[in-house]
Swiss-Prot record:
Keywords: Chloroplast, Plastid, Ribonucleoprotein, Ribosomal protein, RNA-binding, rRNA-binding. The keyword Chloroplast applies. Part of the 30S ribosomal subunit. Contacts protein S5. The interaction surface between S4 and S5 is involved in control of translational fidelity. This is Small ribosomal subunit protein uS4c. It is found in: Plastid, Chloroplast. Belongs to the universal ribosomal protein uS4 family. GO terms for molecular function: rRNA binding; structural constituent of ribosome. One of the primary rRNA binding proteins, it binds directly to 16S rRNA where it nucleates assembly of the body of the 30S subunit. With S5 and S12 plays an important role in translational accuracy. InterPro entries: Ribosomal_uS4 (IPR022801), Ribosomal_uS4_bac-type (IPR005709), Ribosomal_uS4_CS (IPR018079), Ribosomal_uS4_N (IPR001912), S4_RNA-bd (IPR002942), S4_RNA-bd_sf (IPR036986). CDD domains: S4. Residues 89-150 form the S4 RNA-binding domain. Its main location: plastid. It comes from Ipomoea purpurea.
Amino acid sequence: MSRYRGPRFKKIRRLGALPGLTNKRPRAESDLRNQSRSGKKSQYCIRLEEKQKLRFHYGLTERQLIQYVRIARKAKGSTGQVLLQLLEMRLDNILFRLGMASTIPAARQLVNHRHILVNGRIVDIPSYRCKPRDIITSKDNQKSRALIQNSLESSPHEELPNHLALDPSPYYKGLVNQIIDTKWVGLKINEFLVIEYYSRQTN
């Protein structure tokens, strides 16, 4: 299944806020309507919706998400929490959380178009897994800097998660301090329902 490129507002009306996909918010009456329907949902539908929230927020294909679940299952610790850490430490998501891109699709474009450096080297793979002590900057040209500055100036000034830092001078520089603590994940999600959904597909 390919990455979703359809109407974004349609997805947030059904699934709720997906800040990685769009900075728009569902209307309050839409939220109430969805809550009133929730009592009629089967357990399968509830698990499916949690999986879809994760997939659309991070901009993944179905195959990519299944692969991340498989990796998380082989790691030590809670599979659900490891899954969230893997997704949060992707380069496209780190750029989004730093405010250097307004959405994850916008961050993916920055990376694909070779505007982003990690530790002084161009990285053009959005799924690149960032690690502690990584330094993320724009390429040393006016266009790359302007794209990031415009995003930072237009994005809401939310508190950065504690695993990241942003140095504004002389040019914007993002720092990865540590692996994310899952309480700082930027999406309201029940990751355990996602693992349950995939319990048969990934055996």
